Amino acid sequence: MTGRLDEDLKDVTLLGNQNTKYLFEYSPEILEVFDNNHPNRDYFVKFNCPEFTSLCPKTGQPDFATIYISYIPEQKMVESKSLKLYLFSFRNHGDFHEDCMNVIMNDLIKLMDPRYIEVWGKFTPRGGISIDPYCNYGRPGTKYEQMADYRMMNHDLYPETIDNR
């Protein structure tokens, strides 16, 4: 099968919509999915999101990050414009870096039920320290659970320089 029919995309309402509303408060309900046309194949989908912002829950100061989201889909896939708007909704959300990454991962698991997913935030330094939280998930009782354990054990083994933001 090649291409998609309009009926296949009936739940995709934000893509191509010229009346997009940008939400400034955390809004997981904005996320949309579409069907994976290749559910019998393992493959990664990776999003590079270089303009993520949130607020420090204590000081209210802005935090900036590039977020990397990689997943192996099952039946559903997240639509990219809805993901962009969802990430934008963190703009005025006060939470620690680690919490933001886990919230994003949990929302995407709830939305798509992927075989595997990982979310990595590379935050710009504030106060001379950068924080790069990484979280992952593999579907329990499957090879993806073992994959998650392996990737967690081997994650970020090599030191890096701060100029890779």
UniProtKB/Swiss-Prot annotation:
SUPFAM superfamilies documented for this protein: Tetrahydrobiopterin biosynthesis enzymes-like (SSF55620)
Binding site for substrate: 78-80, 97-98
Active site positions, chain numbering: 56 (thioimide intermediate), 63 (proton donor)
A GO cellular-component term linked to this record: cytosol
Superkingdom field: Bacteria
Cell location: Cytoplasm
EC number: 1.7.1.13
Molecular function terms, GO-annotated: preQ1 synthase activity
Signal peptide: none
Pathway assigned to this chain's UniProt record: tRNA modification; tRNA-queuosine biosynthesis
UniProt entry keywords in alphabetical sequence: Cytoplasm, NADP, Oxidoreductase, Queuosine biosynthesis
A GO BP annotation: tRNA modification
UniProt KW Cell division keyword: no
Reaction catalysed by this enzyme: 7-aminomethyl-7-carbaguanine + 2 NADP(+) = 7-cyano-7-deazaguanine + 2 NADPH + 3 H(+)
Coiled-coil ranges from the UniProt annotation: none
Family, similarity comment: Belongs to the GTP cyclohydrolase I family. QueF type 1 subfamily.
Function of the protein: Catalyzes the NADPH-dependent reduction of 7-cyano-7-deazaguanine (preQ0) to 7-aminomethyl-7-deazaguanine (preQ1).
Protein's name according to its UniProt entry: NADPH-dependent 7-cyano-7-deazaguanine reductase
